[in-house]
Curated annotation (Swiss-Prot):
<comment type="similarity">
    <text>Belongs to the RxLR effector family.</text>
</comment>
<protein>
    <recommendedName>
        <fullName>Secreted RxLR effector protein 106</fullName>
    </recommendedName>
</protein>
<feature type="short sequence motif" description="Bipartite nuclear localization signal">
    <location>
        <begin position="239"/>
        <end position="264"/>
    </location>
</feature>
<keyword id="KW-0325">Glycoprotein</keyword>
<keyword id="KW-0732">Signal</keyword>
<comment type="subunit">
    <text>Interacts with host RCD1 and SRO1 transcription co-regulators.</text>
</comment>
<feature type="signal peptide">
    <location>
        <begin position="1"/>
        <end position="24"/>
    </location>
</feature>
<keyword id="KW-1048">Host nucleus</keyword>
<comment type="function">
    <text>Secreted effector that suppresses pathogen-associated molecular pattern (PAMP)-triggered immunity (PTI) in host plants. Binds to RCD1 and SRO1 transcription co-regulators to attenuate transcriptional activation of salicylic acid (SA)-induced defense genes and alters plant growth responses to light. Suppresses SA signal transduction but not SA levels.</text>
</comment>
<feature type="region of interest" description="Disordered">
    <location>
        <begin position="220"/>
        <end position="262"/>
    </location>
</feature>
<keyword id="KW-0964">Secreted</keyword>
<feature type="short sequence motif" description="RxLR-dEER">
    <location>
        <begin position="42"/>
        <end position="54"/>
    </location>
</feature>
<feature type="compositionally biased region" description="Basic and acidic residues">
    <location>
        <begin position="220"/>
        <end position="229"/>
    </location>
</feature>
<feature type="glycosylation site" description="N-linked (GlcNAc...) asparagine">
    <location>
        <position position="182"/>
    </location>
</feature>
<feature type="glycosylation site" description="N-linked (GlcNAc...) asparagine">
    <location>
        <position position="187"/>
    </location>
</feature>
<dbReference type="GO" id="GO:0042025">
    <property type="term" value="C:host cell nucleus"/>
</dbReference>
<dbReference type="GO" id="GO:0005576">
    <property type="term" value="C:extracellular region"/>
</dbReference>
Length: 285
């Protein structure tokens, strides 16, 4: 599995419309993102002329890149990724899982899921899987163990304290030995750290996201029970309330009931994928 291939996915999931500190991000040799107008320039064919299937996947990622703008991680997604990072340094991790076919399947799924705005958590899934693929994709992962340990600790500190700036981590990465294939890993890691920093910075916007989803589910189920069946469509009738009962405020008024329902479904899908990875011995910290 090419480290550079995984890095292209990192570029897609790491860029946010909320990045105000920079106007342009360049991923060497393949992708240029101009944050000022959302314009994406790509020359993917030149990156790997001999692999049409891979180019087709990269083309899909590039085409849907703009749809991923503006959707940030939830705190839960950061914690799940943190757990995966810890597992990466476990010598007992099941290396055969990271075959090119399995990695391609995950990446294709994540790329398609970022097409719809309500699938914000798919970005976290794509990030986690692509980082695993990137680290396992080098010829000799053991040669990167010390640098990866330091990199992991920096990432954890970014999530927990928010005090470390990306530039500090970039400086650390300059000490990663440039063995064959490692240059791409360094670039991939820079995108990963930038995303971790931005995710921490804007985490307050979604700190109550899980509670909102839970309360919304309870409300919809209660409405269906009142109206007498599963075919009840929210919004077609006024909701009856008992004396003294107040209606919970809609904390996501910009989303339709269908979008909220899809968001809940996506959360469950991602949890199931992560659980399967955990059962395979990958997600143990």
């Amino acid at each position: 599995m090419s480290v550079r291939y995984a890095g292209l996915l990192l570029a897609a999931v790491a860029v946010s419309a909320h990045i105000n500190e920079v106007n342009s991000i360049v991923f060497p040799g393949s992708l240029h993102i101009d944050n000022r107008n959302g314009h994406v320039q790509r020359d993917l064919r030149s990156a790997d002329n001999g692999n049409e299937e891979r180019n087709a996947i990269l083309e899909t990622l590039s085409n849907h890149l703009a749809s991923a703008f503006g959707y940030l991680w939830t705190k839960e997604a950061q914690e799940m990724t943190n757990s995966a990072w810890s597992a990466l340094r476990n010598k007992e991790s099941s290396l055969p899982l990271y075959s090119e076919g399995v990695a391609r399947e995950y990446i294709e799924t994540a790329a398609l899921n970022t097409l719809t705005a309500e699938h914000r958590l798919a970005r976290a899934e794509a990030y986690m899987v692509s980082m695993i693929v990137a680290l396992r994709g080098v010829e000799n992962p053991e040669s990167l163990r010390n640098s990866a340990d330091n990199l992991q600790q920096f990432l954890i500190n970014v999530w927990k304290t928010g005090k470390k700036q990306p530039a500090q981590v970039f400086e650390l990465l300059e000490h990663v030995p440039y063995e064959e294939g490692n240059a791409s890993l360094v670039n991939d890691s820079k995108f990963a750290i930038w995303m971790a920093y931005m995710g921490k910075t804007f985490d307050h916007q979604f700190k109550n996201w899980a509670d909102v989803q839970h309360n919304e589910q309870l409300r919809i189920e209660g409405d269906k029970e009142k109206k007498g069946g599963p075919d009840y469509v929210e919004g077609t009738e006024s909701r009856g309330k008992k004396r003294g009962q107040t209606e919970a405020p809609d904390l996501e008024p910009g989303l339709t009931p269908k979008q909220k329902r899809l968001k809940r479904m996506e959360l469950q899908r991602v949890k199931k994928i992560l659980l399967n990875i955990n059962l395979m011995g990958i997600g143990r910290s």
